[in-house]
Amino acid sequence: MKSFYHLTQFVFITFLFTIFRLIGFKNSSNIGFFLGKTLGPIFRSKSSVIQNLKKANINGDFEKITSNVFGNYGRIFAEYVHLKNFKNDKLSKYISIEGKEYLDQIKKNKKKVIFVSGHFNNFELMAMQIEKQGINCAAIYRPLNNPYLNKVMEKMRKRHICKKQ
C-alpha cells in the first residue's frame, strides 16, 4: 500500500513540476507560496511548527509565522524545477551574496570550512553558489521518505546544486 501511495505522490509531484516548468519562475514561485500556505497545514503538523516556534522563543503572531513557513516551503518546492536557470545565471537577479570576500579568501587559501544554513528562502541555493565560486563543496541531504521522489530530487541536487551529496 505504501508503494502505491509513493507512486501516486510521485505522479502528482511530477505533474506539478511540469506545470511549474511551463509557467516560468516568478509564477511558479508565487503559486508555490500560495499552495504551501493553503495546503501545507493539511500535510504537515501545524501544531509542531508552533511548538518549535515557542521552543525557539519566537515572539509574534504564530498563525501568521506558521502560514509564511508553509508558504516558503511551497515556494522552494515550486522553484526546484528552475534550479538549472539559477545554476546558469539566468535567474541571478534573484540572488544576492553578502560576504563574497570570505568566499574568495576560502578559495584562495583552500581553507576547510563548514557552512551552516537554515531553511530560509531557497536554502538550496547556498551550496550552489559556493560551488559556483570554485570552492570544493559537499552538502548533507536527508533522503526523502518517498524513494521515487528521492531519486529525482537527488539527481536534480547533484546536477544543479552540488555534485557531492
Model-derived features with residue positions:
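Catalytic core of membrane glycerolipid acyltransferases/transacylases, capturing the structured
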Residues: K111-Q165
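Membrane-anchoring hydrophobic helices of lipid-metabolizing enzymes
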Residues: M1-S117, N150-K155
